[in-house]
Structure formats: structure tokens, C-alpha cells
Design a protein with these regions (language model features):
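Functional-site microenvironments in short loops/helix caps that host divalent-cation chemistry
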Residues: 2-210, 214, 218, 223, ...
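Short, structured beta-strand segments at or near domain termini in extracellular proteins/domains
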Residues: 223-236
Length: 238
């Protein structure tokens, strides 16, 4: 149960310590080394038709588009969280800190989240023991007892993506913009994804920060993107 408080979401623009110069793009065709269309991939076959989810029933579901998530939530009597709800839950009661466990990425050298170790995308060191997604509860929970709010896989939230929304949004419990707008691809409907994934690291996306946000095409599914449901307290009160 997440306490009802002011819900305010953030992004890289509010993170004074983040240096965009550290986002290296000097690798030859670096984007294409990381991403490739794989015919036949779906949630039952995450990396292609010859793969399966056997032995991964305790991993997050992936390769689902935004509307897949909506339909599952509807079937389960739940819903997707708003971006603000998601961030508040992610912080686990620790306001003003970079990560849901504090400000140090590896306290006492301990891995707190499933992320990429080494230089992305050319050097994968696998120091945390996972090449891709990890079973839920592989890493410590946050202050609210929630697992994998940072890393493992990105998570769809309900909000349309608009980069300037928080310049004019309500300060309390913002519900997201009424329409999608990505200046780089204005004709494509996009929603927000949060939390980062096993592909994130300090020279790539740092998506495991509490305030990090990503935009995703609603028709796009990926091996590193899933979702979680929420339920309103009024739905469970007798």
C-alpha cells in the first residue's frame, strides 16, 4: 500500500549531476549493435521463434505493447499506474535521492539492480550474474517493499509522452498530458516507460534513476520492456 501524498515526476532535466557528454555515441553504427528487429519474437518467445519462457515464470513478462498491458490490466481488474504514481512508488519514501536505495550506485560494492556492467554496447562483463532479465526478488526491495523498480526491464505507464508536460502539469497527482507529442517523431503515438533495464548503464541511459523517463512507440514491443499493474485502494475497501 503506497501512502497518498503529492505525486511529482521528474526527468534528466532535474538531475544536475547528469552529464550528457557521458552518453557515448562514437561507436560505429552503435545503435544497430544494440537493437535488431527479430521476426517471430513475442511474449512467449522473447528473443525469437526458437526461444521460450520455460524456466522464466518468475521473470517479468516482456515483448508486450502498450495495449497488451491495458487488456491484461482490464482482465485482472487493475490498471497501469500513471507516471507520477510510478515514480512515487519507485522512490520508496526516499525523496531527493538518485536511486530508490540511496545516492550511491553500488553501496559497499553491492549490486542493487539488474543493469549492464561494462561499456555499452561493446563490453558486457555480467558482474551481477544476469545477461538479460532476472527473476523477481533477485535484488533488494525498496522502502515500500517493491522489487525491480530500478533496472531489470522498462515498465509501461499510462501517460502519453510529452517532454514539457511537467512545466505546466498539476503539482499534485498529475495524470499525464491529453495527447502524445515527441518533437523528433510528432506523428507517432508514444507513452512513457520507466525504470530502466538490464541494458542501462552509466554511459548509456542511466534509466535506473528514480527520475529517469523514456518514450516508447505504443505499437513497439521489446525484450527489455514489460509492465506492472496497480489497484486503487477504493477498489479493495469493503
Amino acid at each position: 500500500l503506497i501512502p497518498k501524498e503529492n505525486l511529482v515526476a521528474g526527468s534528466l532535466v532535474f538531475n544536475e549531476d547528469f552529464d550528457r557528454e557521458n552518453l557515448r555515441t562514437d561507436y560505429p553504427s552503435w545503435e544497430y549493435q544494440a537493437w535488431k528487429y527479430q521476426k517471430g519474437a513475442d511474449w512467449r518467445h522473447p528473443t525469437g521463434p526458437d526461444s521460450s519462457i520455460e524456466g522464466k515464470m518468475d521473470h517479468p513478462v516482456v515483448n508486450v505493447v502498450y495495449r497488451d498491458c491495458l487488456e491484461y490490466c482490464k482482465w485482472a481488474g487493475k490498471r497501469l499506474p500513471t507516471e507520477a504514481e510510478w515514480e512515487y512508488a519507485s522512490r520508496g519514501g526516499k525523496e531527493g535521492q538518485k536511486y530508490n536505495w540511496g545516492n550511491e550506485f553500488q553501496p559497499d560494492g553491492k549490486y542493487m539492480t539488474n543493469s549492464w556492467q561494462g561499456t555499452f554496447p561493446t563490453d558486457r562483463q555480467n558482474l551481477d550474474g544476469f545477461l538479460d532479465s532476472s527473476p523477481v526478488k533477485s535484488f533488494p526491495p525498496n522502502g515500500y517493499g517493491l522489487y525491480d523498480m530500478s533496472g531489470n526491464v522498462w515498465e509501461w505507464v499510462n501517460d502519453y509522452y510529452r517532454p514539457d508536460y511537467y512545466n505546466f502539469s498539476p503539482k499534485r497527482n498529475p495524470q499525464g498530458p491529453t495527447a502524445s507529442f515527441d518533437p523528433g517523431e510528432p506523428t507517432i503515438e508514444k507513452r512513457v516507460t520507466r525504470g530502466g533495464s538490464f541494458l542501462c548503464n552509466s554511459n548509456n541511459c542511466t534509466g535506473y534513476r528514480n527520475a529517469a523517463r523514456m518514450r516508447s512507440d505504443v505499437s513497439s514491443a521489446a525484450y527489455h520492456t514489460g509492465f506492472r499493474c496497480v489497484i486503487d485502494t477504493k477498489m479493495v475497501k469493503k
